[in-house]
Amino acid sequence: MKLKRGLAGLLTVIVFAVWPIQAVLAEETDEEAKLEAEKNASLAAPIDTNSLEEWPEGPAVYAQSAIVMDMGSGAVLYAKKPDERHYPASITKLLTTLAALENGTLTDRVTFSQESVDILNWDDASIGMRPGEEISMEDALYAVLLASANEVSYAVAESTGRNHLNGGYDTFIELMNQRSAELGCTGSNWVNPHGLHDDNHYTTARDMALIASAVYQREEFREIMNTLEYHIPATNLENEERIFQQNHKMLWE
């Protein structure tokens, strides 16, 4: 299988669209109709950059907010409500990864506490780590970015906070907010490293573009994101290796 590279390395594209998931969950006809109306309204919402003189008109998209930013210059090429707040869900893990890479090493040991696995509901993304289990930071970040493993994100925060920040989980969350502000993010608040829902955990399309541009500068991040399949070897508590694949369809051919 051939890996695709190209424009994905030049532009940061952030889109907040929630209706497809909600529509699947909706059981009542009136609720589906309401969601369909909201979806159509999002398509009709004005695009900020279309009001610029002598600027190419951008396409309508089914999204509450969207942005296309050139990573080299920071120029915004397309924007639709880029500063409106939204719940980021798993793209939170981009900031988690950035903070971990900037403050630790890939050879660090990540240890899983009871708290790290207790956050999970039955349908949350996970690779089945157990309390007391240990893996390397490198293995952990592959699990965070390729498998979107929520318990691993929590353990990365705990371990980095403990090993490098003279604190623990809460110290890492403070660092996430500090780093976000340093990047110029003005509409974000981070309360966890995984993105599981919290009313006080939010960001904007513009802020996520800034975060994505920053983490993309890290060679370790690019290497992980260009990996199609990864194997975590047996651990101190698990005899079998864990295998997961890249789910980004633009990278497969």
Functional labels for PLM-detected ranges:
Residues 1-2, 185-189, 197-253:
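Domain-terminus/edge residues, biased toward the C-terminal soluble/receptor-binding domains
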Residues 3-25:
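Sec-dependent N-terminal signal peptides of Gram-positive bacterial secreted proteins and lipoproteins
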Residues 11, 175-176, 246:
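Generic structural signal for hydrophobic residues
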Residues 26-206, 210, 215-219:
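Active-site-adjacent loops and short helices of periplasmic peptidoglycan-processing enzymes
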